[in-house]
Amino acid sequence: MTDNRVENSSGRAARKLRLALMGPAFIAAIGYIDPGNFATNIQAGASFGYQLLWVVVWANLMAMLIQILSAKLGIATGKNLAEQIRDHYPRPVVWFYWVQAEIIAMATDLAEFIGAAIGFKLILGVSLLQGAVLTGIATFLILMLQRRGQKPLEKVIGGLLLFVAAAYIVELFFSQPDMAQLGKGMVIPALPNPEAVFLAAGVLGATIMPHVIYLHSSLTQHLHGGTRQQRYSATKWDVAIAMTIAGFVNLAMMATAAAAFHFSGHTGIADLDQAYLTLEPLLSHAAATVFGLSLVAAGLSSTVVGTLAGQVVMQGFVRFHIPLWVRRTITMLPSFIVILMGLDPTRILVMSQVLLSFGIALALVPLLIFTSNATLMGELVNTRRVKQIGWIIVVLVVALNIWLLVGTVMGLS
């Protein structure tokens, strides 16, 4: 009887710790459903139906492992990835890493900010510039929560992630995809032509985001409670739940586009405005509105996450700190310049995804090196199998992103 009480008590304590440590992965997961994912998944679903769903499944599994490694680095060492690079690499390398990470954070933010502005434009009927102003105000308000600590921000961003997931449950109800074909597309790899290969590379490139690799290790480095092993165990649950939700959203985006556009003959849908305007007559005004709201929620939350990531890389690499509101103001400027110049926002979204491809390997390689170092990681060091899978992911991601980059430059998209 005593043994049972002790067992029940330890089980309750483990569940309590797991719940207390839940949140960082939800912030990181937002990076996986940003407006760049909207654009890529919609184009893939409209062009090839359910045939590229398997890419989303595998990309999400890869992203899940990467985020676990990032979170584990913070737990095991008490330092984030940027700080580890600063401590172990020569100063010129560190400065190079800082500059490229800042550029990538700004490119990411550009896509996310413009995506949210497009969402406001679609649902409110305002101009893109007015949508950008609303986006700026909303992100300032969300960032103010950071003054109260990490938990309130985790709750708001986690809530926005769940809202986007709920929105896509509604979209699936409206679009009524063929579940048998959807299941087949998730498990049977298919690349019917070179354009499909290009889009598959785009889906992967839009899924694995370098800025959240830096950010996640920062979100877990100050976690308290339990042993390191217990914190790591709780974090794996956090990542599994958050990334499963993000994976569902990406699958639902592509499946909705397939059901609504591909099988109705609208295979040329390539931008967010067009997707919104086509959804209304095909499904309903409600379906189009839900799409617009989900785009706003994803854009707002991901642009906040991008601002936080930029702060982490600056503090980590060069020990320099500026207030979040100053960083938010500076990183908004490129978005307003793009809008005022009248550039195509969807094309800017795509170009920003290509720019991100440069930073993925630069973040992944040191992450794998550090998490495979027994001196740094102790009992949380990577197993041989994790190392092997990690390096396979690095090679695959680099190869596909080179393909994506070359294809974009050559105008194959």
Swiss-Prot record:
Keywords: Cell inner membrane, Cell membrane, Ion transport, Membrane, Symport, Transmembrane, Transmembrane helix, Transport. The keyword Acetylation does not apply. One of its GO terms (cellular component) is plasma membrane. Its main location: membrane. GO terms for biological process: iron ion transmembrane transport. The chain crosses the membrane at residues 20-39, 52-71, 96-118, 126-145, 156-175, 197-220, 239-258, 277-297, 328-344, 351-370, 388-406. Disulfide bonds: none annotated. It comes from the Bacteria. The keyword Cell inner membrane applies. It is a multi-pass membrane protein. It is found in: Cell inner membrane. Residues 1-19, 72-95, 146-155, 221-238, 298-327, 371-387 are cytoplasmic. GO terms for molecular function: cadmium ion transmembrane transporter activity; manganese ion transmembrane transporter activity; metal ion binding; symporter activity. PANTHER family: NATURAL RESISTANCE-ASSOCIATED MACROPHAGE PROTEIN 2, SOLUTE CARRIER PROTEIN FAMILY 11 MEMBER. Belongs to the NRAMP family. This is Divalent metal cation transporter MntH.
